[in-house]
């Protein structure tokens, strides 16, 4: 009887440890973007973040997978909303979160929340997705960038883009919740 339950029990106990183990980082450019040609060819679907750490990060937006989330990013970027905002929650080996004007994870834009657009895009290194509260339909202005793959988040958050350039600068975003000296978005722009 013990043998019948020992192996499955051991597998269950070990699974969380393996699921949360950091994965060796690969360059973002080496990972597939899973974007159709029509998306990658459109410069208006490039979101550029100039960071206070001296780097520039370029995100390929995916309106084919998350049209409402991408339109929200574009609208707020055109308004200058992201300029000066900090990455307020940065967990090494997991992700960097920004887009909150309050800087504590509780803020958002004055615009209404966006409904969830869960899609088939996976949480890989460089994935950019909409941060939200407990309700799936509570995304607003906050977003996060993955340092490592985390499949446990797939189909639970709206993935709307992928870093295609400057992942090394994402890796240099100051850690902390919040960081003592946070990395900021100096300027966010579209195109390029």
List each model region and its residues.
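Cyclophilin-like peptidyl-prolyl cis-trans isomerases
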Residues: 2-8, 18-192
């Amino acid at each position: 009887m013990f043998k019948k339950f020992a192996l499955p029990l051991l597998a269950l106990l070990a699974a969380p440890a393996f699921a949360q183990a950091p994965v060796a980082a690969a360059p973002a450019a080496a990972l597939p973007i899973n974007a159709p040609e029509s998306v990658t060819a459109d410069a208006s679907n490039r979101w550029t973040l100039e960071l206070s750490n001296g780097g520039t990060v370029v995100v390929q937006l995916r309106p084919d997978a998350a049209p409402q989330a991408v339109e929200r990013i574009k609208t707020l970027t055109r308004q200058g909303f992201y300029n000066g905002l900090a990455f307020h929650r940065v967990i090494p080996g997991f992700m960097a979160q920004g887009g909150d004007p309050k800087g504590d994870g509780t803020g958002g834009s004055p615009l209404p929340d966006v409904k969830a657009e869960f899609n088939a895009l996976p949480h890989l290194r460089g994935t950019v997705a909409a941060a939200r509260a407990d309700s799936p339909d509570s995304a607003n202005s906050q977003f996060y960038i993955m340092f490592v793959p985390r499949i446990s988040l797939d189909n639970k958050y709206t993935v709307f883009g992928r870093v295609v350039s400057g992942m090394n600068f994402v890796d240099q975003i100051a850690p902390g919740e919040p960081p003592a000296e946070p990395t900021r978005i100096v300027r966010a722009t579209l195109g390029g």
